[in-house]
């Protein structure tokens, strides 16, 4: 049995997902595509040798009879309208981040989904599908290190483009930690503070880099996340969990241990795509399997909403220098079904 998928947006990530669904993953078939540049959509399916209909816009893809599930990989500000349309049509939808560009937009999606009476939306947070993070969560859940007391984390990029801003350290970079750490701890944030150390010499004039983000959770766990997007040396993700009776650390990506020229060394990756490439495959395969089973289990619209509310608080903390409360409403029981 195959799931017939329609794709809205054939840019870089859209092309990657089309390739995955048609060449790598099991149980899926791309049957419809659209892009603001129709020629781009046509070229993608031609180059991949796919027989799919090219539609004028996302609404036509959503309402096409042959489409059973939708992938939204278009421009970020268009995500909300297409997700809402898919939910209204009663179709499962996988939406790359952001779910919406505002917390209010995410809330509208949560409300629309709840009105349908079943989960229809999955958000494209891929780190919960990374083998290393899953192993780390297994250790935490097992109780081997006791209750988590502190987390020390880092998200480092070698460099960023000239258009990267201080707030993008939250919305484009930290957003992944915001989601995955909630998932790791099964806990919500209650406050955040952002501290700016001495500025890195490679940071552009308009960018404050690095940053240290300090969270407190509802259960009292303290989290510090270093965001350093001009570290120069590579793409480096770190996460160390300090518990009552032990410490668990996110494993490093597998690489050859090299002994050469009087040195012992491991390679450090430089591209985020290489670091999480397998997680993207696992994530989308899980979505396909869940839709065929008619029960989504991945990151939900509520997770997207929680991430947006938290990101807004982080930006407020950047601007004020104060500890900012993070106020999430009660999660609907709908998401516990």
From Swiss-Prot:
Subunit relationships: Homotetramer.
ATP-binding as UniProt keyword: no
A Pfam match: GFO_IDH_MocA_C
EC code(s) of this entry: 1.1.1.18
Superkingdom, natural source: Bacteria
GO terms of molecular function: inositol 2-dehydrogenase (NAD+) activity; nucleotide binding
UniProt catalytic activity: myo-inositol + NAD(+) = scyllo-inosose + NADH + H(+)
Species annotation: Yersinia enterocolitica serotype O:8 / biotype 1B (strain NCTC 13174 / 8081)
Name assigned to this protein: Inositol 2-dehydrogenase
């Amino acid at each position: 049995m195959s799931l017939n998928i329609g794709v809205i947006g054939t840019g870089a990530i859209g092309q990657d997902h089309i390739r995955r669904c048609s060449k790598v993953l099991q149980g899926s078939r791309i049957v419809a595509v659209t892009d603001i540049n129709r020629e781009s959509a046509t070229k993608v399916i031609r180059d991949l040798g796919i027989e799919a209909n090219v539609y004028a816009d996302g609404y036509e893809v959503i309402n096409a009879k042959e489409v059973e599930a939708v992938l939204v990989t278009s421009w970020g500000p268009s995500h909300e309208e297409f997700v809402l349309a898919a939910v209204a049509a009663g179709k499962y939808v996988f939406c790359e981040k952001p779910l919406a560009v505002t917390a209010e937009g995410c809330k509208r999606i949560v409300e629309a989904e709840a009105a349908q009476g079943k989960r229809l939306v999955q958000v494209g947070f891929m780190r919960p599908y990374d083998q290393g993070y899953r192993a780390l969560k297994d250790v935490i859940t097992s109780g081997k290190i006791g209750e988590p007391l502190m987390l020390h984390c880092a998200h480092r990029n070698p460099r960023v483009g000239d258009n990267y801003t201080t707030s993008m350290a939250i919305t484009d970079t930290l957003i992944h930690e915001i989601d995955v750490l909630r998932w790791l701890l099964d806990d919500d944030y209650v406050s955040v503070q952002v501290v700016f150390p001495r500025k890195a010499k490679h940071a552009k004039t308009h960018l404050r880099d690095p940053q240290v983000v300090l969270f407190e959770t509802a259960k009292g766990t303290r989290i510090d996340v270093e965001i350093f997007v001009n570290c120069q040396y590579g793409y480096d993700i770190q996460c160390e969990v300090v518990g009552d009776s032990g410490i668990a650390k996110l494993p490093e990506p597998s690489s050859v241990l090299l002994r050469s020229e009087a040195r012992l060394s491991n390679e450090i990756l430089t591209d985020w795509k290489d670091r999480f490439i397998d997680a993207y495959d696992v994530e989308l395969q899980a979505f396909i399997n869940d839709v065929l089973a008619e029960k989504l289990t991945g990151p939900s619209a509520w997770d997207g909403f929680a991430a947006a509310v938290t990101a807004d608080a982080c930006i407020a903390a950047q601007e004020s220098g104060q500890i900012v409360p993070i106020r999430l409403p009660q999660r609907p029981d709908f998401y516990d079904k």
